[in-house]
Amino acid sequence: MPKFDYAKAGVDIREEERAIKSLASVIKHVRSGFGRPILTSHYAGVIDCGDFGITITTDGVGSKILVAEKMRKFDTIGIDCVAMNVNDLLAIGSEPLAMVDYIAIEKPDEWIMAEIAKGLEEGCRIANITLLGGETATLPEIIRGFDLAGTAIGWVKKDAIITGEKIEEGDVIFAIPSSGIHSNGLTLARKVVEAAGLSYHDKFGDKTIGEELLTPTRIYMEILDVLRECEVHGLAHITGSGLLKLKRLKNMKYVIDKPLKPQEIFRFIQKLGEVEEAEMYRTFNMGMGFMVILPEDEADKLKKLCEGRVVGYVEKGEGVYVKDLRLDA
């Protein structure tokens, strides 16, 4: 089997970044006064509402939906939709409050919609947010199957926004485990599985391959306790582009010298598709779904609040390294 990477699977992150820059370069209007933006181009945006900021972000489930369709199992992708949005709000120090969903569908199906709703309800329960409403669009000439996305809002005190600017040399990187593949890298995972001639119904441990890939994205509500108890310098929700998400923070050198052990699904994909190690870490979370950057003397306090451990450190310089591999070379 030929070697796979994300671009060969159909998702070129660099091409996507160029397209996003092209879009952003045209949009110039900015509101002033009440509601003016005080943070943009981060995990979430923040608008000024006096003593506090309203935070907002939007995200979707991506091609995980195609696995759900193959398995005819739709009751957990709603959790993924909530998680992808809520975790991005948490990643700037914001408390999530509410969200709306958007479903674009080829043909309305009552059973599928009810199953999606089960996951949305469970995700909202875990995150303690309200689903205020949403939009369902029937688009038979545009959509094959359906797409699921959401937009979430939260709040944060303006002096408590976490951007990563406080990160300094000597800080440590604490990783909180993921529940599995989450909602990123599924295009590569699917291409590898399908090219190998495997079925999503084939056994994978005590589950099937499809069931393992559909494991819901973890919602990291413990971050709110971490923010109350610890001196946090930076937060990273590890999603698309994997550990390169650390580059969204302050321009420093991030060294992951003792990564958490990835779940078996990652090594399965890597071996099956002959995917290079660096490509794995810049595509998947590799068992590390959320990262907290903080002073070394705060790490023991953090360990009492959430699962995980210190996996690396911050130095002057630039780049993201896993052991001796530079991911952004």
Swiss-Prot record:
Q: Where would you find this protein in the cell?
A: Cytoplasm
Q: What InterPro entries would the database entry show?
A: PurM-like_C_dom, PurM-like_C_sf, PurM-like_N, PurM-like_N_sf, PurM_cligase
Chief subcellular location: cytoplasm
Top-rank EC class of the record's enzyme: ligase
Enzyme Commission number, as recorded: 6.3.3.1
Q: Does the keyword Cytoplasm apply?
A: yes
What's a GO biological-process term for it?
Answer: adenine biosynthetic process
Domain of life, per the record?
A: Archaea
Record's Gene Ontology CC terms?
cytosol
Membrane-spanning ranges: none
Output the Gene Ontology terms for molecular function.
Answer: ATP binding; phosphoribosylamine-glycine ligase activity; phosphoribosylformylglycinamidine cyclo-ligase activity
Biochemical pathway? Purine metabolism; IMP biosynthesis via de novo pathway; 5-amino-1-(5-phospho-D-ribosyl)imidazole from N(2)-formyl-N(1)-(5-phospho-D-ribosyl)glycinamide: step 2/2
The record lists the catalysed reaction(s) as:
2-formamido-N(1)-(5-O-phospho-beta-D-ribosyl)acetamidine + ATP = 5-amino-1-(5-phospho-beta-D-ribosyl)imidazole + ADP + phosphate + H(+)
The alphabetical list of record keywords is: ATP-binding, Cytoplasm, Ligase, Nucleotide-binding, Purine biosynthesis
Query: In which family does this protein belong, per the annotation?
Result: Belongs to the AIR synthase family.
Query: This chain belongs to which protein, by name?
Result: Phosphoribosylformylglycinamidine cyclo-ligase
Q: Which organism is it from?
A: Archaeoglobus fulgidus (strain ATCC 49558 / DSM 4304 / JCM 9628 / NBRC 100126 / VC-16)
Q: What is the lineage of its organism?
A: Archaea, Methanobacteriati, Methanobacteriota, Archaeoglobi, Archaeoglobales
